[in-house]
Regions:
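Flexible "cap/lid" subdomain of the alpha/beta-hydrolase fold that forms the substrate-access gate
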Residues: 46, 51, 75-115, 119, ...
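Catalytic histidine-centered segment of alpha/beta-hydrolase-like enzymes
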Residues: 310-325, 329
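A short loop-to-beta-strand scaffold at the N-terminal edge of the catalytic core in hydrolase folds
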Residues: 15-31
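Short, amphipathic alpha-helical "lid/cap" segments that border enzyme active or binding sites
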Residues: 97, 101, 325-333
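An N-terminal hydrophobic leader/cap segment in hydrolases
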Residues: 1-17
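Conserved HGGG/HGGXW glycine-rich cap/lid loop of the alpha/beta-hydrolase fold
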Residues: 31-80
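Alpha/beta-hydrolase fold active-site loops
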Residues: 36-37, 117, 308
């Protein structure tokens, strides 16, 4: 496994627009600018660019691809923009989408190929703004250059689009244990952010630490030890880690005040036009996907409705694109070139 000390450096770093301004984000570029394929990669909590750098480096070579690595707003640290200068309240779902859109624009501008095919690759919390972006941009006739040709989601999958509600295959209901695990860790992270940012930094750290220990003791922590080395290699100090939990705070707050349902947090509706590859690790205490969406994609592949498909890496956890880079890379390259 590649560590932070051996990460392949980007060949170029270009700015992209966020709510913080024209230079709000930094896009790490890998590969030939005239490659026929381009891909934007974005991870989730609690990761900056580094988690995707090794994967992007190899994807650029083996997939004949220009790859741009971004991260969620507020998740990166640069000399000219330390994390303490990011928005104190964190970034809303709409803010995150603006960042994805800005990164795609910058990636398109960096590409010199006349007809490059765009793939979006998103992991964990990156899937949320990735899904919102693709749902919105596919409805914009005036922005064809920003529309992806294919999408790839790692380990998180949102519900089917509302237009599919009458054509969803049967799928098993999540167990009570799985539901409890999913709710508990989200609430712990949301409250940790709330306490640190608005009450006391010490209280935030105490609540986060006690909550983490309690989840381990009660076997409510969603991941197994297969992912421990990845966390260790990309670990940040506690205040930084807690600040990066702002998506959980906005999630809990939006569900509480009823605004969550206004967002198009779902799969995109036309899987034939824009095929979707979903890869997930099977070695976890819970899964971060909707079972009906997995069943939907499995039917797409089984019946040949689209090029969409699902792959489960049974022995891997949440960070399989780090711990089992070869298998993940093979699947993504094959999907992009199909």
């Amino acid at each position: 496994m590649v560590t932070n000390d051996t990460l392949p450096p980007p060949e170029k770093v270009v700015p992209y627009e966020t709510v913080d301004g024209a230079n709000g984000g930094a896009l790490y570029l890998y590969g030939n600018t005239n490659a026929p394929n381009i891909a934007v990669c974005c991870a989730g909590y609690p990761d900056d660019h580094s988690i995707f750098q090794s994967f992007a480096f190899r994807l650029a070579k083996e997939g004949d691809c220009l790859v741009g690595v971004m991260c969620l707003p507020g998740f990166d640290d640069r000399e000219e923009k330390p994390w303490t200068t990011h928005k104190y309240d964190g970034y809303t779902f709409d803010d995150m989408v603006i960042s994805v859109r800005g990164a795609v624009k910058a990636l398109r501008a960096a590409s010199t190929h006349e007809d490059s095919k765009l793939t979006g690759i998103f992991h964990d919390w990156g899937v949320v703004p990735g899904s919102l972006w693709v749902n919105r941009v596919l409805e914009e006739a005036e922005s064809p250059e920003l529309q992806p040709d294919k999408m790839v989601y790692f380990d998180v999958l949102l519900p089917p689009h509302k237009v599919m509600k009458n054509d969803i295959p049967d799928a098993p209901k999540p167990t009570l244990a799985r539901t409890v695990v999913e709710i508990v860790y989200k609430i712990v992270l949301a409250i940790s952010f709330l306490l640190q940012q608005y009450v006391s930094k010490i209280l935030g750290v105490i609540f986060y630490s006690v909550g983490l220990v309690a989840m381990y003791i009660l076997r409510l922590y969603p991941l197994y030890h297969v992912d421990d080395k990845v966390f260790s290699a990309h670990q940040k100090h506690l205040n930084r880690t807690i600040y990066m939990a702002y998506p959980y705070w906005f999630l809990v707050k939006s569900v509480w005040n009823g605004t969550f349902w206004a967002y198009e947090m779902s799969l995109h509706k036309d899987l034939k036009k824009t095929p979707l590859l979903y890869i997930y690790g099977g070695n976890k205490r819970t899964h971060f996907h909707r079972n009906e969406s997995v069943a939907l994609l499995e039917r797409e592949e089984r019946e040949g409705r689209s090029d969409s498909k699902v792959i489960c890496l049974e022995d891997d956890g949440h960070f399989f694109y780090v711990t089992n880079e070869d298998a993940c890379l093979d699947a993504v390259v094959s999907f992009m070139k199909n």
